[in-house]
């Protein structure tokens, strides 16, 4: 799992207004067994998001999959159905954000409202190739 330094804590703090724009938020308790950082509840779907500092915000999706491999594995244990989504939010030291939906087999770039970006393809981390869900 990636470390939780001061930059990661700043990313969580800065994520709160973004999350509040999407609905009510509930922060997860800290600790070694924490799976996600916050939940967003409004209409379906409920969002479980993990917020991370990104040393290379412009990295390709395959590079991000490799860098956040342990975090993605942790997020994939969350039970999923049509009523929830799992997201990874990353923030650069300059405040640039990128958002991703985590599926059982792929990472898909989304906007801050949770909508898939039309021009972006997904990346399957089970096969290591573009595509997936």
Go through each PLM region and give its residues.
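Domain-level recognition of nuclease-like catalytic cores that cleave nucleotide substrates
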Residues: 80-133
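Active-site beta-strand-loop-beta-strand hairpin of nuclease catalytic cores
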Residues: 14-27, 39-50
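Short, flexible, glycine/charge-rich loop motifs used to bind or transfer phosphoryl groups or to couple energy/partner
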Residues: 28-29, 77
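Short acidic/glycine-enriched loop/turn segments that link adjacent beta-strands
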Residues: 32-35
């Amino acid at each position: 799992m990636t470390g939780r330094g001061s930059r990661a804590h700043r990313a969580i703090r800065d994520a709160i207004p973004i999350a509040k724009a999407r609905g009510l938020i509930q922060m997860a308790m800290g600790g070694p067994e924490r799976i996600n950082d916050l939940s967003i509840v409004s209409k379906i779907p409920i969002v479980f998001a993990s917020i991370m500092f990104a040393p290379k915000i412009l990295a390709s999706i395959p590079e991000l999959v490799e860098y956040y491999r342990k975090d993605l594995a942790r997020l994939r244990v969350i039970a999923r159905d049509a009523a929830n989504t799992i997201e990874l939010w990353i923030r650069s030291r300059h405040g640039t954000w990128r958002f991703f939906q985590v599926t059982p087999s792929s990472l898909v770039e989304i906007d801050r409202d949770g909508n898939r970006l039309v021009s972006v393809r997904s990346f399957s981390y089970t096969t290591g190739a573009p595509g997936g869900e």
